C-alpha cells in the first residue's frame, strides 16, 4: 500500500500534467462537436496572410504572427513555420494574400508594389550645364578651390587636435622621477 503523502503527491502531479496539456486549448462549446484527435494534434498558427514566396523574409515576418526569429551569423532564420507550401506560387502577381479582407494594414502591405531600384543609365541624366535642382555646375577651377579649402580645413583640424592632446598629457619634472 502506498503511503498517504505519496498518494497525494501522485494525484497532484497527475492533475498538474493534465492541466498543463490543456493549457493552450479553448474549451469546446456544448453546441459544437469536439475536434478530432488529428485536428487537436496539429497546431494552427495564427497568420495574417499567406506569402507568395518563403524567401521574402519581410513578408514572412509580417504575415506569421507567432514565429520565433533566430539570428544566425549567415542569415536570419524563421523557426516554427512548418513545411513549405507544396504548390508553386510564382503565378501570383501579389506579394501575399490576406486572411481577412477587412485588414487594411495587410491589404496595404500585400498589394503594394515594391519600389524599383534606382538605375542610372549613362547619358540619361541632366544636361551637363545644369546640376539637379537648377544649380549651375561649378567650373573646374571652383571645384579645385573647394577641394583645397576642404584639405586645408582638415589639416588645420588635425593640428589643433594634436595640440589639445599634448596639453592634456601630464608633464613630469625630473625630481618626480628620482
Curated annotation (Swiss-Prot):
InterPro entries: Endothelin (IPR020475), Endothelin_toxin_CS (IPR019764), Endothln-like_toxin (IPR001928). Residues 96-111 are annotated as: Endothelin-like. The keyword Transcription does not apply. One of its GO terms (cellular component) is extracellular space. Keywords: Cleavage on pair of basic residues, Disulfide bond, Secreted, Signal, Vasoactive, Vasoconstrictor. GO terms for biological process: intracellular calcium ion homeostasis; positive regulation of smooth muscle contraction; regulation of systemic arterial blood pressure by endothelin; regulation of vasoconstriction; vein smooth muscle contraction. Pfam families: Endothelin. Disulfide bonds join 49-63, 51-59. Residues 1-26 form the signal peptide. PANTHER family: ENDOTHELIN, ENDOTHELIN-2. Endothelins are endothelium-derived vasoconstrictor peptides. This is Endothelin-2. It comes from Felis catus.
Amino acid at each position: 500500500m502506498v503511503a498517504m503523502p505519496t498518494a497525494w503527491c501522485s494525484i497532484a502531479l497527475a492533475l498538474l500534467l493534465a492541466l498543463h496539456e490543456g493549457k493552450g486549448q479553448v474549451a469546446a462549446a456544448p453546441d459544437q462537436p469536439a475536434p478530432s484527435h488529428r485536428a487537436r494534434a496539429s497546431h494552427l498558427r495564427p497568420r495574417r496572410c499567406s506569402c507568395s514566396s518563403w524567401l521574402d523574409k519581410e513578408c514572412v515576418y509580417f504575415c506569421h504572427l507567432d514565429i520565433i526569429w533566430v539570428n544566425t551569423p549567415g542569415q536570419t532564420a524563421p523557426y516554427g513555420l512548418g513545411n513549405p507550401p507544396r504548390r508553386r506560387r510564382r503565378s501570383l502577381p501579389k506579394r501575399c494574400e490576406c486572411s481577412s479582407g477587412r485588414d487594411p494594414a495587410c491589404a496595404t502591405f500585400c498589394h503594394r508594389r515594391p519600389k524599383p531600384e534606382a538605375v542610372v543609365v549613362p547619358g540619361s541624366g541632366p544636361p551637363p550645364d545644369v546640376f539637379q535642382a537648377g544649380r549651375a555646375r561649378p567650373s573646374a577651377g571652383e571645384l579645385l578651390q573647394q577641394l583645397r579649402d576642404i584639405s586645408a580645413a582638415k589639416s588645420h583640424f588635425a593640428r589643433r587636435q594634436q595640440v589639445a592632446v599634448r596639453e592634456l598629457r601630464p608633464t613630469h619634472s625630473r625630481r618626480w622621477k628620482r
